[in-house]
Each structure stands twice: as C-alpha cells, then as structure tokens.
Amino acid sequence: MNKVGLKQNGRFYYGWILMIVGFILMSLAYTGSISITSVFVVPVTEAFGIDRGSFLLYQTVLTLTAVVVTAYFGKRMAKGRLKLIVVISALVAAVGYLLFAWAKAVYWFYFGAVLIGVGFTNCTVLPMSIILNNWFGGKVRGTVMGFCFVGSGVGGLVILPILNSVITNSGWRTGYIALACMFGIVAFVSLLFLVKTPQERGFTRMGETAEETKAVEDAAGMNIKEAIKTPMFWLILATATLMVFGSSAILFNSAPFFIECGFSTQKAALVASFNLGMLAVGKIFIGFICDKLGTKFGSILSGAIFGLGFLSLALMPMNPNVFVFGAVICYGIGGGGITVCPPLLVNALFGEKDYGNIVAAMNMATNLGGAIGGTIAGVIYDITGSYVVFWCIAAAMMAVVVVFRVICFKLRKKYTY
C-alpha cells in the first residue's frame, strides 16, 4: 500500500506495535548485551585482579559467537519460526548472565559470553530488520527502523545510571542478575507480541505498492550468490565492520576513559549514558535522513560525523570539559547509522530478492567489528596507558568508510534492478 498512516483498511496497523516491541527488545537485549559493558570494567577487573584486555575478551567471544549464530539463523529466521527462535535465545542469554553473576574465575565470563551471544544476535537487529522490512516499505522503512533501533540508545540512557547504582550499592554480581532478568522480560514480550508478516494479521506492507509486497524470492535484485561476486558486496560489508569496530570500543571503554580524563566514577557513568541517549536522537535523525534524502546520503553522513566523534575523543585529554560535548554529539548522530543503515543499504544496493540472507551477512560483518574493536582498544590501553592512539586509528577508519560507501553507490549504477 502506498498510503502511510496509523490505520490500514479501517484497522490500527499492527506494524506500529511491532515498532514499539522492537524498541523494547533493543532497549533491553541490545543494551543488556553491549551497551552496559563499560560500567563493569573497573569493578570486575579489580575483583579478579586482571587487566582490562583479559576481561573484555569476553566481548570478543560474544561477538564471534554472534557471527556464527547469524550465519546459522539468518536464513532460518527469514524462512522459518522467527518468534520461537527469539524467545528461546532470550532465555539462553539469561542463563549466560547467571553464569557471570556466579563467576569464580575470568573463564566463566568466556563460557557465559557464548550464551549471551546467542541472545544478542537473535533478539535485536537481525529479527527486527526482517520483521520491519516485511511490514514497512521504502517510504517509511528508514524512519521506522530508526525509532525501533533507538531503543538501544534510550535503554542505555535509562539503564546505565540505574545499573551503575546497583553495582555501587549491591555489587557487580547483582548487576548481572538484573541483566538476566531483563532477558527474561525480552522472552515474555516476544512471545506475546512478535508477528513476522503482515499477512498473518490480514494486512499488507505499508509504504509500498501492492507489487512490492510480493514474496522476497519474486522481488528484484541479487541473491546472495550473485552479491558475493561483486566488489560492492565486500566494500559495504567492510564499512559495517569498521563502524562497529570503532563503536564497540566506545561502548566497552567509555566510562574508564572518562575516568582517565579526570571525571568521577559517577560522572563518567553519567556521560556514558548521555552517549547512549544521544545515540537515540541519532538513530531517528539518520533514519529520517535516509527516507527523505536517500540511503546514500544518510549512510555517508553517518560515517563522516562518526569520524569527528573519534577526533573529539582523541582531543579530550587536552580539555575534557570542552571536547566531551563534541564526542557525545558526534557519537550519537554518527553512531545512529550503525544499526539503521545496514538493512537500508541492503535494500538500496541489492534489492529484496534475497533480503534475509544478505542482511544476515551484514549482521555478521557488524558482529565481526564488535568482536575485535573493544578488546583491541583495551589492549592498546594496557600497552600505552592511553586510549588516544585507538581513537586516532578509528577516526582514520571512518574516512575509509566514507570513501567505500561512495564507491559502492557508484558501482550500483551498473545494475538495473
């Protein structure tokens, strides 16, 4: 349907409820897997007497698990019982966080991270990208995904200060129990509300023509086998990897870095939560820009602004109270494209012929970046005593992202679908 509104054929359009459900899942599952890491770094490393790189290695295990899980479940979600996969995966992640809470040594975190990696992958971007692509067409898809994925930012803004207070007053083990409970809520909400396709509720996809609501295999574009033979595919995957390589370093190390810059523990946690709050604004902004000015412009703008964020971080030790504003604003606006742009880039560059498999490949690329970025930043800190070197490397990587995305859209002109 071309018309975009709250109702379709006289009934409230259920896709809007799914947008809110996605917001909740991102608020709890994404924040609970990734965004909260930095507030645990200091208390856990001090409790076990380990360096930051050793602790943050669990995030590498988590995200490498996510790469494998995405490869296995991407097609199964697109073609099979998506809701069942999400519910079971959320419960698996809850068990993982209970292992964290009961940890007797650092290797407990590595085992638990495998379970959390399953929940992180199967309860956040991958299923919601598939669901929202089924329910919403190109006229509104970017904005809808922006509102959905903004949950990770809003969730961080709300949850991070609360979690920091829990850790301060009751200990980090209690903090991990709270995260296990959050994944229990994810399972419950998913069981009640997730609906994979509009046809299951008697609707058609909103924001597209009737012809564009055909089955994915009948839509125009490339399948995964055709896509992997093009430079465009590998370049766009590289940009997704590089964006998350930098982002994961901020998520995992921001609070310790702000403390190194002279902020108190409470102020550092507050600024880290502001980072995530600004990310909420950025996701809505980038989604809106992609809808109104095109995915090309929105995705390139995202990479450029994100690079300015890393430059601000590199300059923070010189004047923390000034450059922190640039870091927070640019991280939020630029980082807003990290989850919003990849599914839109799949539509823009490869069409909908094999959307589920190609978006799964994009998800694998983002997870690969997350697997190494935060840990490498921690290792560089352990070696040099500073994060500045990493921030400079990340800023250079964002310049590469911009160039690669420009090239991809030039290559796209060769294809007629």
Name every feature range the model reports, one short phrase each:
Residues 147, 156, 349-384:
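A late C-terminal transmembrane helix in Major Facilitator Superfamily
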Residues 68-106:
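Conserved MFS/SLC helix-loop-helix module at the cytosolic interface between two early adjacent transmembrane helices
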Residues 17-43, 48-52, 73, 160, ...:
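Extracytoplasmic
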Residues 44, 122-136, 337-350:
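Intracellular juxtamembrane helix-capping segments at the cytosolic ends
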Residues 33-41, 225-286:
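Extracytoplasmic gate region of multi-pass secondary transporters
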Residues 148, 152-199:
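Helix-loop-helix hairpin linking two adjacent transmembrane segments in secondary transporters
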Residues 69-81, 283-294, 381-382:
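Helix-to-loop junctions at the C-terminal end of transmembrane segments
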Residues 273-279, 284-285, 290-345:
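C-terminal transmembrane helical hairpin of 12-TM major facilitator-type secondary transporters
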